[in-house]
Swiss-Prot record:
It holds the Pfam family Ribosomal_S14. One of its GO terms (cellular component) is cytosolic small ribosomal subunit. Keywords: Metal-binding, Ribonucleoprotein, Ribosomal protein, Zinc. This is Small ribosomal subunit protein uS14. It comes from Triticum aestivum (Wheat).
Length: 56
């Protein structure tokens, strides 16, 4: 196996790397609460469409 084939060759079934945003595919800043599976940037842009209301 060459050097370029080593990275991401092992399947990720658990941990932070296994979960990605359903909108953009990003794995950083993921909101999993209520089954959103959405990163915080996508949540800010789509929160009103989902039904979340900002009180402050």
């Amino acid at each position: 196996m060459g050097h370029s084939n080593v990275w991401n060759s092992h399947p990720k079934n658990y941990g932070a790397g296994s979960r990605v945003c359903r909108v953009c595919g990003n794995s950083h800043g993921l909101i999993r609460k209520y089954g959103l599976m959405c990163c915080r940037q996508c949540f800010r842009s789509d929160a009103k469409d989902i039904g979340f209301i900002k009180y402050r």
